Swiss-Prot record:
Keywords: Cell cycle, Cell division, Cell inner membrane, Cell membrane, Cell shape, Cell wall biogenesis/degradation, Magnesium, Membrane, Metal-binding, Peptidoglycan synthesis, Transferase, Transmembrane, Transmembrane helix
Pfam families listed in its UniProt record: Glycos_transf_4
Top-level class of the enzyme under EC nomenclature: transferase
Role noted for this protein: Catalyzes the initial step of the lipid cycle reactions in the biosynthesis of the cell wall peptidoglycan: transfers peptidoglycan precursor phospho-MurNAc-pentapeptide from UDP-MurNAc-pentapeptide onto the lipid carrier undecaprenyl phosphate, yielding undecaprenyl-pyrophosphoryl-MurNAc-pentapeptide, known as lipid I.
GO BP term, pick one: cell division
Gene Ontology CC, one term: plasma membrane
Family the entry assigns: Belongs to the glycosyltransferase 4 family. MraY subfamily.
PROSITE patterns: MRAY_2
GO molecular function, one term: UDP-N-acetylmuramoyl-L-alanyl-D-glutamyl-meso-2,6-diaminopimelyl-D-alanyl-D-alanine:undecaprenyl-phosphate transferase activity
Protein name: Phospho-N-acetylmuramoyl-pentapeptide-transferase
Length: 306
């Protein structure tokens, strides 16, 4: 335990130094976030904020690529993180668009196909201690849904200072407790949490750096693969809390607009709706933290009481 705490203590300051250097480097080079005109007007002041702070999430898992127990989790994090990095770089090159949504989903599918080869191939799906499904076809379908959906969901959540990072932190703390009997996996999660804390040091409102797609996709790949390894694929519905709500708000908005030519929300994802309703950014973030935590606790109660 002392060794674990020592490693994370040192890692925290290493990540802080890396992020501080990365922020200063981008400022000196004039690199920063481009805010699109159709976004909330309150975000225009964020223009020019350094990006791609999520690179530290890839650094946190890279050493674990060389261990059998953590290879799949690390590979998932790195591959999805690299997809996000390419998207960030394209956004810097062409400020209006990065990788097109359909192409991004297709690339996510290719990555998931690669990851399936290295996955545990345990086709059983549990709810608590109860075996719900034992079917390779259904499991493969669920595997692809999870690995594609979670990174994209966290990417949609990453729209306010500290929102995606803070909610991911809550999810990972619960996954750390659940994984504590797997020493290498627990160490990897603890280092990711440490990287997140270092990132949030600079991402708290007003943010000095954004995680970028590289961070959102890396976190998504990490959380999704952890749920597969820990056999909590169904519990992930609750562990995803706010990520799921944000994604559903986009789906509902698009579907209803195509159907009725009307919008349910002032803007989606739903955190922008509350911004346009006049809520302060910090109030939205903290209330979303609370909702996310309550959903996870509710899911855990159902999981263990089953």
């Amino acid at each position: 335990m002392i060794a674990l705490l020592s490693i994370n203590f040192v890692a925290f300051f290493v990540f802080l130094l890396i992020l501080k250097y990365w922020i200063n480097f981008q400022r000196n080079k004039g690199i920063g976030k481009y805010i699109r005109k159709e976004g909330p007007s309150s975000h225009f002041q964020k223009s020019g904020t350094p990006v791609m702070g999520g690179i530290v999430f890839i650094l946190a898992v890279f050493p674990f690529l060389f261990f059998k127990e953590t290879f799949f989790i690390s590979l998932s994090t790195i591959l999805f993180g690299l997809l996000g990095l390419v998207d960030d770089l394209k956004l810097m090159e062409n400020k209006d668009y990065g990788i097109r949504p359909l192409r991004k989903i297709f690339l996510s599918f290719i990555i998931t196909l690669i990851l399936y080869v290295f996955s545990p191939h345990d086709y059983k799906i549990y709810w608590g201690s109860h075996l719900i499904i034992d079917s390779s076809i259904l499991y493969i379908f669920l595997f692809f849904i999870i690995l594609i959906a979670v990174p994209n969901a966290i990417n949609l959540t990453d729209g306010l200072d500290g929102l995606a990072g803070g909610t991911s932190l809550v999810t990972l703390i619960f996954l750390l407790v659940y994984s504590f009997h797997f020493k290498k996996i627990a160490l990897e999660i603890s280092l990711m949490i440490t990287a997140l804390l270092a990132f949030l040091w600079f991402n708290s409102h007003p943010a000095e750096i954004f995680m970028g797609d590289v961070g959102a996709f890396a976190l998504g790949g990490f959380i999704a693969s952890l749920s597969v390894v820990n056999k909590v694929e169904l519990l992930l519905i609750f562990l995803s809390g706010i990520f799921l709500i944000e994604s559903l708000s986009v789906f509902i908005q698009v579907f209803f607009y195509k159907w009725k030519k009307k919008r349910i929300f002032l803007m989606s994802p739903i955190h922008h709706h509350f911004e346009l309703k006049g809520w302060k950014e910090t109030k939205i973030v903290w209330r979303f933290y609370i909702i996310h935590l309550l959903i996870i606790i509710g899911g855990l109660v159902l999981w263990y009481w089953s």
